[in-house]
Regions:
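Extended, aromatic/histidine-rich regions of cofactor-dependent oxidoreductases associated
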Residues: 2-5, 29, 173-209
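Hydrophobic membrane-insertion alpha-helices, especially the h-region
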Residues: 6-23
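Contiguous hydrophobic, core-forming segments of folded domains
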Residues: 33, 40-44, 48-49
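Extracytoplasmic/periplasmic/luminal assembly and interaction segments
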Residues: 38, 53-97
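A mature extracytoplasmic/lumenal domain signature
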Residues: 80, 120-124, 140-142, 169-173, ...
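Mid-length scaffold segments of soluble, non-membrane domains
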Residues: 84-150
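Acidic, glycine-rich flexible loop segments
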Residues: 137-164, 168-173
Length: 209
């Protein structure tokens, strides 16, 4: 009788420790607080004169960007399949020009009970900072209603041989051309047009042109 009792006690302690560790490392606050700090930092950038995309008059009246509430269900792990032929796409830009991007891989995942797929891109003429990140321009059913009509972007850190990638739609952002027509931005290609709404990330800025 002693041994089973000890095993039960040990199992109980292990279970308590598991939930403690899970709560410590995976609770919402550990994710949401840094996300909100990032958003505040971006607001500061938009208010500043150096790196803000806003025209001077809009910048002087700027208060903050508008976002959906953080939603952990829209931070998804996707399976990555590198494309055997990584061809170059001349992605259309908002001014009618094109910019070269490498079709690097596809990411498959499930949202709202439906299978989804996005193509992950690398800019051909990329900077050192862009070397280990992938670019994901996409559209969804919120565009033109609650989010910028031209789509939104994700920048994703990525390791060369990774089999999965996290698509954190809470970090989806509007391109600079959503705030100022003087900027030129990529237009999300056909294969990245989602058939569902992604109510996460940056919303339409009411002070935009």
């Amino acid at each position: 009788m002693k041994r089973p009792l000890r095993l039960i006690i040990f199992a109980g302690i292990a279970l308590v420790l598991f939930y403690f560790v899970q709560e410590t490392f995976f609770n919402d606050d550990n994710y949401i607080k840094p996300l909100l700090q990032e958003r505040k930092a971006k607001d500061l950038t938009f208010r500043g004169r150096t790196n803000s995309p806003l025209p001077d008059e809009s910048r002087r009246n700027f208060k903050n960007l508008v976002y959906y509430e953080p939603n952990l269900d829209l931070r998804v792990k996707a399976k990555v399949a590198q494309l055997p032929k990584q061809d170059t796409l001349l992605m259309p830009m908002t001014n009618g020009s094109t910019e070269a991007y490498l079709r690097y891989a596809t990411a498959t995942f499930e949202l709202q009970g439906q299978p989804q797929r996005l193509t992950l891109y690398k800019k051909v003429n990329r900077t050192a900072d862009e070397e280990e990140q992938l670019f994901v321009p996409f559209t969804d059913k919120t565009n033109g209603f609650e989010t910028y009509g031209g789509g939104r972007f994700l920048d994703i850190p990525f390791e060369e041989d990774a089999e999965t990638v996290v698509l954190d739609f809470n970090r989806a952002y509007s391109p600079f051309c959503a705030f100022n027509p003087d900027y030129v931005c990529p237009v999300p290609p056909q294969d990245n047009r989602l058939s569902i709404a992604i109510p996460a990330g940056e919303k339409t800025y009411e002070g935009a042109h």
